[in-house]
UniProtKB/Swiss-Prot annotation:
Annotated heme b b566 binding sites: 97, 196
Recorded family membership: Belongs to the cytochrome b family.
Entry binding sites for a ubiquinone: 201
Superkingdom in the source lineage: Eukaryota
Family annotation (PROSITE patterns): CYTB_CTER, CYTB_NTER
Protein name, per record: Cytochrome b
Pfam families, A to Z: Cytochrom_B_C (PF00032), Cytochrome_B (PF00033)
Length: 379
């Protein structure tokens, strides 16, 4: 008799995705981040659901409802901090996952890659709206500053901003709709993640060498299920260490002050995972130019498959490209640092140089470098 997992319509899908899936025999720990992102999404949805049971999306009570969760709800503090720091873990995994894709040339699976970019935008939108919900000073002013950027769109900008606000400023209507969107988006993300996997399983996984691995495949279970389980253990350990020992390490103290439209914080800045994009936005003196650069800083990932000029897929055997890749990583870390600094000398010029280098590396240096490496192959 055939095993039920191979015949049952629902079990069959799970079987082909997670059990009998042929996987390359040599994929490294860098391939763990897909499953870790799934775990992060699961943690965020579960903790978020429990938070939503006690949260009120009203300007008068939002801040005190979060305080109530932390003080009066059983284990509310750990749920709240797991949700807040879970977002940080989510973005750490996201950045490493995208970095892996760039390094090993996984972007040549263009459908999977493009769905991934959509996922990145969706997660960023969700995180932004979630940051507004506690209705602290940074929540309010962050929402005001970022939504205001849409006013840079010619002709319809101002109307668009007021439409999103539901009034003439960030107020009760804005908070309520942000809560609604923050609740629904993770489920859209989960659906997109399934499409992401669907496209990935059409082609099969890439591997560190970038060479087609059809000749040497192994079953996903037990080899990669146990490997993923180890990754889960690491992630949960790191998350719990952060939550239990230093829950406010990555937060902003200003957000423990209730939102006050009459008092602007000295430095309005987003959470750490948006600082690189915020630095790019600030590095351009023109408002519309800044917004354009902000969107392009992520959207530029979509042109990576078109800019792949190398005869090899992976950077594993391309030392010059590797150097440029690590310069790009260092550049992003520099941008993250600059995003958290005040707008004054020398931070302004450093931010402008780092922003220029970011686009110049991806659009010019890396493709040219790949062409040079192609020539070196003929020696």
């Amino acid at each position: 008799m055939t095993n039920i997992r191979k015949t049952h319509p629902l079990m069959k899908i799970i079987n082909h995705s997670f059990i009998d899936l042929p996987a390359p025999s040599n994929i490294s720990a860098w391939w763990n981040f897909g499953s870790l992102l799934g775990l992060c999404l699961g943690i965020q949805i579960i903790t978020g659901l429990f938070l939503a049971m006690h949260y009120t999306s009203d300007t008068l009570t939002a801040f005190s409802s979060v305080t109530h969760i932390c003080r009066d709800v059983n284990y509310g503090w750990i749920i709240r901090y797991m949700h807040a720091n879970g977002a940080s873990m989510f973005f750490i995994c996201l950045f490493l996952h995208v970095g892996r894709g760039i390094y090993y040339g996984s972007y040549t699976y263009s459908e999977t890659w493009n769905i991934g970019i959509l996922l990145l935008f969706a997660v960023m939108a969700t995180a932004f709206m979630g940051y507004v919900l506690p209705w602290g000073q940074m929540s309010f002013w962050g929402a005001t500053v970022i939504t205001n950027l849409l006013s840079a769109i010619p002709y319809i900008g101002t109307d668009l901003v007021q439409w999103i606000w539901g009034g003439f400023s960030v107020d009760k209507a804005t908070l309520t709709r942000f809560f609604a969107f923050h609740f629904i988006l993770p489920f859209i993300i989960a659906a997109l993640a399934m499409v992401h996997l669907l496209f990935l399983h059409e082609t099969g996984s890439n591997n560190p060498t970038g060479i087609i691995s059809n000749a040497d495949k192994i079953p996903f279970h037990p080899y990669y299920t146990i490997k993923d389980a180890l990754g889960f253990l690491f992630l949960i350990t790191l998350l719990l260490t952060l939550v239990l020992f230093s829950p406010d390490l990555l937060g902003d103290p200003d957000n423990y002050t209730p939102a006050n439209p009459l008092n602007t914080p000295p430095h309005x800045k987003p959470e750490w995972y948006f600082l690189f994009a915020y630095a790019i936005l600030r590095s351009i003196p023109n408002k519309f130019g800044g917004v354009l650069a902000l969107v392009l800083s992520i959207a530029i990932l979509a042109v990576m498959p078109l800019l792949h000029t190398s005869k090899q897929r992976s950077m594993m055997f391309r030392p010059i490209s590797q150097i440029l890749f690590w310069i790009l990583v260092a550049d992003l870390l520099t941008l993250t640092w600059i995003g958290g600094q005040p707008v004054e000398h020398p931070f302004i010029i450093i931010g402008q140089l780092a922003s220029f280098l970011y686009f110049f590396l991806i659009l010019v240096l890396m493709p040219i470098c790949s062409l040079i490496e192609n020539k070196l192959l003929k020696w």
